Design a protein with these regions (language model features):
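Bacterial N-terminal signal peptides that target proteins for export
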Residues: 1-10
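C-terminal motif of bacterial Sec signal peptides marking the signal peptidase cleavage site
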Residues: 17-20
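Post-signal peptide N-terminal segment of mature Sec-exported envelope proteins
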Residues: 29-59, 73
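A glycine-rich, hydrophobic loop/mini-helix early in the fold
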Residues: 62-88
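Surface-exposed patches in mature extracellular/periplasmic domains of secreted proteins
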Residues: 64-67, 87-94, 116-117, 221-227
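Mid-length scaffold segments of soluble, non-membrane domains
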Residues: 74, 86-152
């Protein structure tokens, strides 16, 4: 555990250092690298990930897939509650904790989203949003292998969430833990199947479209749906 905490701290500090050194005039200084990773992800997705996700969707009936999605969403609520606390959003943290308890008990370990039926809002907060909430800039845009769009700040946040806050990481058995991670990623990809081809068809430059959409979406999320006007931090010209 001490080694794990040390790794988390080092990852966070390294990410924050890079964020602090980033230029705000052009937030895609890594574009050459990013486009290479984007192309790799696209090839891997079309060759392997998308077909497997399609088979997953075809084989499992909708109620089963909904249960899987609800289960992992419920685990994600735990991560959101921690980040709400770190952002001092105590009312949202209490609401999220109540949602987690309701779904974990009456929802049969989260397989059924009872809380949404009761009108309790589903929210998602992560450590990248927490850093943004406290004024940490996004840093350069970054495309992660297999994971897709991110930024230096959000990649740092993802590392902290994954290594410290995600309940799955505390599963002792490696086979069970890795299977849970793989199933969660497969479920998320299966949900995106209906819109998989729209990006290539609609955008002249899918990479630039994805980058701009991601950065604007994160700006919106960090400000809880009421963001100030975008400044030159998001100017990619």
């Amino acid at each position: 555990m001490q080694i794990q905490i040390k790794n988390i701290v080092l990852t966070a500090l390294f990410g924050l250092m890079l964020t602090g050194c980033a230029s705000t005039a052009n937030n895609d200084p890594l574009e050459g690298f990013n486009r290479g990773v984007y192309k790799f992800n696209d090839v891997a997705d079309k060759a392997v990930i998308k077909p497997v996700a399609g088979a997953y969707k075809a084989v499992l009936p909708s109620p089963v897939r909904s249960g899987v999605n609800n289960f992992f969403d419920n685990l994600g609520t735990f991560v959101s509650v921690i980040n709400d606390l770190l952002q001092f959003k105590f009312d949202k943290a209490v609401e999220g904790a109540g949602r987690f308890v309701i779904n974990s008990t009456f929802g049969v370990a989260g397989l059924v989203d009872v809380a949404s039926m009761d009108g309790i809002e589903k929210r998602k907060e992560d450590f990248g949003q927490t850093l943004g909430h406290w004024g940490v800039g996004s840093g350069p845009y970054l495309v992660l292998p297999f994971l897709g769009p991110s930024s230096i700040r959000d990649a740092t946040g993802l590392a902290v969430d994954t290594l410290a806050f995600d309940p799955v990481v505390y599963v002792d058995d490696p086979a069970t833990r890795n299977s849970a991670v793989a199933l969660r990623m497969l479920d998320r990809r299966a949900q995106l199947l209906p819109g998989s081809d729209l990006l290539d068809e609609a955008a002249l430059d899918p990479y630039a479209f994805m980058r701009d959409a991601y950065m604007q979406r994160r700006h919106h999320q960090i400000h809880d749906g009421n963001p100030p006007a975008l400044d030159d931090e998001y100017d990619f010209d």
